[in-house]
């Protein structure tokens, strides 16, 4: 594949030399800022994705009314019924989640990359997964509330369980009073595998693709197009691999709980996986695939591009 672009005289792609590390708090802050910036633009697609993934929960295809039939139609339905603000439901919780999760994830990965821990495909995958697991665990309460708020709407277009929170703060207080501290981390057993897989794919693909594009000399070595192309490739890879994990995570987070503070529909990741496949077929794991791709591809592209550019701009001022 390389020869189609580089010819026989092009240098063999290999890992780029590690960048000098930024001050860790700055690195974490830049990761958070980059992903929060991307989140503002892609949150309406996250709302639509959540609704599509909850539609027809544990019901066979054709046995339920499809209120949402695709990305554009779903955006229209939400905008018409809930107003323009409805397209940004859960934005505050989404920004908190992106700031916590991706600040930790990208910041810790950058520190491992600077230390040379990520050299080699397997090492970058493991480092990306570890960074993702850390970020997902810490930020899980924010994702829980985000899912509840984005699923919440008027009865005419409601899908999934409706939690009827008044906002992010009241949701956190309500969940804590009803279920305790553990309730704030309900669904984390679906979030950690989801982000581990997505993070490993995103960071390893982005790093490898950028090295390959730079070494095959598609563009000048300092061109931002190297970063942009690598980010697009990373976004496509993440969208394909992450969708089943995303569906399971959404279901675990949004399910109601019983008087024993246990989920009424699923008791864990594997149970959810088996029940979805049994009731909805394997394709049930790919519900919302289009909005996942439409959201994740630009979100990954924007966040990876912003993160890389911000780090490049910050580097001269920290050394």
Curated annotation (Swiss-Prot):
Location in the cell: Mitochondrion inner membrane
Pfam family, one: Mito_carr
Principal cellular location given in the protein's record: mitochondrion
Start and stop residues of the Solcar repeats: 22-115, 119-212, 222-313
Keyword Plastid assigned: no
Coiled-coil annotated residue ranges, if any: none
Entry's transmembrane regions: 25-45, 63-83, 116-138, 188-209, 224-244, 296-319
Keywords assigned by UniProt, alphabetized: Membrane, Mitochondrion, Mitochondrion inner membrane, Repeat, Transmembrane, Transmembrane helix, Transport
Segments for region (Disordered): 1-22
InterPro entries per the UniProt record, alphabetical: Mito_Carrier_Antiporter, Mitochondrial_sb/sol_carrier, Mt_carrier_dom_sf
Comp. bias intervals (Pro residues): 10-22
Membrane topology, as annotated: Multi-pass membrane protein
GO cellular component terms, A-Z: mitochondrial inner membrane
Family affiliation: Belongs to the mitochondrial carrier (TC 2.A.29) family.
UniProt-recorded name of the protein: Solute carrier family 25 member 34
Gene designation: slc25a34
């Amino acid at each position: 594949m390389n020869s189609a672009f580089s010819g026989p005289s092009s240098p063999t792609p290999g890992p780029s030399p590690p960048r000098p590390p930024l001050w860790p708090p700055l690195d974490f802050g830049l990761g958070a800022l980059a992903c929060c910036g991307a989140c503002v633009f892609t949150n309406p697609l996250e709302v639509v994705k959540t609704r599509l993934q909850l539609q027809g929960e544990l019901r066979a295809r054709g046995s339920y009314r499809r209120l949402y039939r695709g990305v554009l139609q779903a955006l229209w339905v939400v905008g018409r019924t809930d107003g323009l603000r409805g397209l940004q439901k859960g934005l505050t919780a989404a920004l908190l989640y992106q700031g916590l999760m991706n600040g930790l994830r990208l910041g810790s990965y950058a520190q491992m990359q600077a230390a040379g821990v990520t050299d080699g495909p397997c090492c970058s995958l493991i480092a990306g997964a570890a960074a993702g697991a850390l970020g997902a665990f810490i930020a899980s309460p924010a994702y829980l509330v985000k899912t509840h708020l984005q699923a919440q709407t008027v009865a005419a277009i409601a899908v999934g369980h409706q939690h009827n929170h008044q906002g992010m703060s009241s949701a956190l207080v309500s969940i804590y009073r009803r279920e305790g501290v553990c309730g704030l981390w309900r669904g984390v057993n679906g979030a950690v595998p989801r982000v581990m897989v997505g993070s490993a794919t995103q960071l390893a693909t982005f790093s490898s693709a950028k090295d390959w594009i730079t070494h095959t000399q598609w563009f000048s070595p300092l061109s931002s197009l190297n970063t942009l192309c690598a980010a697009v490739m990373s976004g496509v890879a993440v969208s394909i691999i992450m969708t089943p994990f995303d569906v399971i995570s959404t279901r675990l987070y949004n399910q109601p709980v019983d008087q024993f503070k246990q989920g009424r529909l699923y008791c864990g990741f594997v149970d959810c996986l088996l029940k979805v496949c049994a009731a909805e077929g394997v394709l049930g794991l790919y519900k919302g695939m289009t909005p996942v791709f439409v959201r994740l591809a630009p979100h990954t592209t924007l966040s990876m591009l912003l993160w890389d550019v911000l780090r490049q701009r910050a580097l001269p001022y920290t050394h």
